Amino acid sequence: TDQAALAQFGEHIVLTAAQLPKVANASPLVLPLTFRSLAALEADFTLFVHVFGPLEPAGQQPPALLSQWDGWPLHDNFATSGWKAAERLGFRVAVPLPANAPPGEYRVELGWYESSTGARLPVSAAKREIHDNVLVLGNFILSEN
């Protein structure tokens, strides 16, 4: 695996950089992400980002899905089937946050699925939590506007 990899999705997509703000107070939540392909990709995969919360104290109900974003990189203009080997791609994902979302701590997760089937790519990551083929990117605080 890639030394700089935060996570690998399937056989060929590597997340090399991700910036999650510590605090956010306005919609949308902007996430700069950088991916690299280990080989040319033949299929189209869709990136998804989920925001859960607010996070309850440990042992309480699992947090609800607050918001999500699904799409292709670069405003849906760069399908993964066009990625070449060693393609490096940095772009921002803007996840809308509801105006009435209560202040508190929220969790961000992301992953990829095959556009035609919806099947999620398996995820591997050395230092981050994974579940259900989803990478837990981290938490942020939503403050009062």
Feature-to-residue mapping (PLM):
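C-terminal luminal/periplasmic domains and tails of membrane-associated envelope-modifying transferases
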Residues: 1-145
